[in-house]
Each structure stands twice: as C-alpha cells, then as structure tokens.
A protein has these predicted regions:
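Glycine-rich hexapeptide-repeat left-handed beta-helix
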Residues: 2-27, 66, 72-138
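Extended, small-residue-rich solenoid/repeat segments and analogous flexible loops
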Residues: 1-67
Length: 138
C-alpha cells in the first residue's frame, strides 16, 4: 500500500500536501519533520517546516504552525496552538485550548495553563514548582 496524501490550500493559495503520521495518524505536512516516536492525534496537524521531536505528544485538535518546534517529551494539549516559529521546550506542557504566539518560547519543563495565551515573541518561564516536578530545583 502506497503513501496517501491529503492536500489543502493555504492562506496564500498554495497547495500544501500532508500525510498521516505513523504514530497516531495525525496530519503532517510533507516538509515537516516529526519523529516516529512522537504521537500526533488523528485530529491534530503539523504545518510545513515544523519539527516535533522524540516522544512529544500533539493532543486532539492540536495545531503546530509553520516552522515551530515541539521539543522532546513536550505535550501539546487539546485544541492548543503553537504559533509560527514558536519553540516549546523539552518536557514542557501546553494546556488545553492554550495559544503560544508566533516566535514565542516556552522554557524546558514549563507548564502553560489551560486557555492561557503567550504573546508573540514572549518567553514563558518554568516555575520553581515546574522545575521541582522534574527534579531540577531544591
């Protein structure tokens, strides 16, 4: 059985091609890089140029925008959005319905609360509690 593709027209009228990810069957642009150990829910999608690293999870309805990076073991919650060029650090959690703005950064181990908005270009820092959870703070 060959690889099947789904095509969408983007906001500029350019036809973009997506394939179903091996782990979870979510839609991944052919120019995105998603590790086979990452889980992409069937209702989630990863846009062109984005990268999803090892053991990351993109939850139901999650959207990883163009050129964004979701680092190792990070979790993107239900209907959460990672903006264009944003970076979600290792072991970070983006809560359900949260929005990470374009070019924003979520530090390693940080937990972005449900429905929170991280503004374009901002940095969301890990709290002491977040770091303790990971064994990184006294």
């Amino acid at each position: 059985v060959g690889i099947s593709y789904v095509e969408f027209e983007d906001e500029n009228g350019v036809l973009r091609r997506y394939r179903k990810h091996v782990n979870g069957r979510g839609l991944v642009a052919t120019t995105a890089k998603v590790d086979p150990t990452a889980f992409v829910d069937p209702t989630a999608y990863v846009d062109p140029g984005a990268e999803v690293q090892r053991h990351a999870v993109i939850g139901p309805g999650g959207w990883v925008d163009r050129d964004a990076i979701v680092a190792e073991r990070a979790e993107i919650g239900v209907r959460a959005h990672v903006g264009r060029g944003a970076v979600v650090g290792r072991n970070a959690v983006v809560g359900p319905y949260a929005s990470i703005g374009a070019a924003a950064r979520v530090q390693n181990g940080a937990r972005v609360p449900r429905e929170a908005k991280v503004a374009e270009g901002d940095e969301y820092r890990a709290s002491t509690e977040d770091l303790r959870r990971l064994g990184l703070a006294a």
